[in-house]
């Protein structure tokens, strides 16, 4: 099954995408959501124009043995591919840790990947009731939050992160999201400020943080055992 993994891009070395490890990133092709701030819209179709064969990925990893410590399966939405669990297992057989970037679009598929995963960067889009305005897909928030429950129950190491574009969030909405996350047991939360430039929705333009944002960052630092503010 792993031979069928559709990879639309590869970053050969990163210190940012898997905390504490030297890793490469595989951008898995395909996503069922249409997040307005998505900065990799070329990965949304199930099949892209620039595909990297799984055999070539494995050959690359073999050459990097002794340097790389982990592989991050990103997207797109990697869990939509049935080949993902087998691909992650193969990476672990090579002595590498398997990281996953996911929004848990389909909770059952997300659950199938978790046993093969060493760390998850989990994307919480918004409160469940607010998520459709970001993803463009009805009931996406319910799926997102159900997968978060599965992640917290699994014991797999994680960070939860929310991408914030100030045309889609205000301070109070972000505060409520953070309170809800802390209430369900999230201990590690990252706010990612959305990039300007290439994104799926051209109507989203660079928007400065509202007055009071600095005070909110202080609140979130006090709320979570681990909190970080970063650029997406």
Features from the language model and the residues they span:
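Conserved AdoMet/S-adenosylmethionine-binding subsite of the radical SAM
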Residues: 58-70, 79-205
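Conserved alpha-helical substructure of the radical SAM core
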Residues: 41-71
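Canonical Radical SAM [4Fe-4S] cluster-binding loop centered on the CxxxCxxC motif
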Residues: 16-52
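SEC14/CRAL-TRIO lipid-binding/transfer domains and related phosphoinositide-recognition modules
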Residues: 5-11, 28-30, 43-44, 56
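A secondary-structure boundary/capping signal
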Residues: 27, 74-75
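Generic beta-structure capping elements
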Residues: 10, 29, 41, 125-127, ...
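Auxiliary Fe-S-binding modules of radical SAM enzymes
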Residues: 1-16, 20, 166-232
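Flexible, glycine- and charge-enriched loops at secondary-structure boundaries
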Residues: 50-51, 137-141, 206, 210-213
């Amino acid at each position: 099954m792993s031979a069928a993994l559709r990879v639309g891009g590869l970053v050969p070395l990163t210190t940012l995408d898997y905390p504490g490890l030297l890793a490469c990133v595989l951008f898995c092709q395909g996503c069922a959501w249409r997040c307005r701030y998505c900065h990799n819209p070329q990965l949304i179709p199930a099949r892209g124009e620039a595909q990297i064969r799984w055999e070539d990925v494995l050959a690359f990893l073999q050459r990097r043995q002794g340097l790389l410590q982990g592989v991050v399966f990103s997207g797109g939405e990697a869990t939509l591919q049935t080949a993902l669990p087998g691909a992650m297992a193969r990476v672990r057989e090579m002595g590498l840790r398997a990281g996953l970037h996911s929004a848990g679009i389909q909770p059952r598929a997300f659950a199938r990947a978790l046993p093969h995963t060493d760390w998850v960067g989990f994307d919480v889009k918004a409160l469940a009731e607010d998520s459709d305005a970001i993803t463009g897909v009805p009931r996406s928030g319910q799926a997102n939050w159900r997968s978060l429950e599965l992640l917290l129950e699994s014991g797999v190491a994680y960070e939860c992160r929310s991408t914030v574009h100030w045309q889609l969030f205000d301070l109070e909405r972000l505060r409520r999201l953070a309170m809800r996350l802390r209430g369900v047991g999230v201990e590690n939360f990252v706010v990612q400020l959305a990039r300007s430039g290439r994104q799926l929705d051209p109507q989203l333009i660079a928007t400065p943080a509202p007055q009071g944002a600095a005070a909110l960052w202080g609140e979130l630092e006090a709320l979570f055992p681990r909190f970080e503010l970063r650029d997406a």
